[in-house]
């Protein structure tokens, strides 16, 4: 059974604009949806945008803490922990059983491997492998985690 806060916003358009010939900003429609797994916990003021070119997906048994943002086209695997004030930008993929600790920013199109950990206050701009601990600004590899 999913526990989704009343203040969570799920399925709104993502933030994508292009300019026309005059320079005016034109909003780009997002035509895909959000697929939610089972046994989720989605906290207060979480936002999960629908996809632009694929569904945004939250895997089974994943827990998302208050004030987190999940952008369009993101895929989060099963049994992940996404802590408070995390921003996961467009088209990021997070592998099963991974954890992203508070106040992290994950740049667009980054891939985070399974069973990996992102330390608090990190800015991730590079792909993270399976079973890796990363942290810092910018985030860097710290160590391999036990399997």
Regions found by a protein language model. Name each.
Residues 3-35, 40, 44-45, 49-60, ...:
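Glycine-rich hexapeptide-repeat left-handed beta-helix
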